Design a protein with these regions (language model features):
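Acidic, mature catalytic/reactive cores of soluble proteins
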Residues: 1-152
Length: 152
């Protein structure tokens, strides 16, 4: 079992570079920073919201904090553009479902690693914007939050 875990970890570590997408990778929605997509090959080449939380956990383990920061800054860019962090970052991404709000955890994780107070201050307003989105656009009649599409 331990040997298999080591193989998986080595595979991931050796393939991070295959998942890096250049900021202009998708022509329909250009991200300001290079980012890590969930797949090296295949159709999942956009920046996906909650996948990025777990991706960032992995890049921290492998000491690639700069990619975690890029991912966060790209999600913050999408939040500014769409008013929410969409499921996937592409031109029509805000039409798709939102996902659980994990941006605050990503910001906290990065801050815990970097101790970058300016980053934290700059992120605060955007985190407040995401909070307000969830408290006004993603709250049910019973007061609980839920994720859905803008058409629900």
């Amino acid at each position: 079992m331990q040997e298999n875990l080591i193989k998986v970890k080595d595979y991931i570590k050796n393939n991070w570079t295959r998942t890096i997408r250049k900021k202009d990778y998708k022509k329909d929605f250009t991200m300001p920073y290079d980012y890590i997509s969930p797949c090296a090959d295949g159709h999942l080449t956009e920046l996906y919201y909650w996948d990025t939380y777990f991706t960032n956990k992995g890049v921290y383990i492998d000491n690639l904090e700069n990619y975690a920061l890029n991912n966060i800054l790209d999600l913050q860019y999408a939040l500014k553009k769409f008013g929410c962090v969409p499921n996937m970052c592409r031109k029509d991404g805000a039409e798709y479902s939102s996902q659980p709000p994990l941006l605050f955890l990503m910001v906290n994780d990065y801050y815990q690693k970097s101790k970058d107070v300016e980053f934290l201050k700059e992120s605060y307003t955007l985190l407040e914007k995401e909070y307000n989105f969830w408290m006004t656009k993603r709250v049910s009649n019973n007061g609980l939050n839920h994720y859905c599409t803008n058409h629900d």
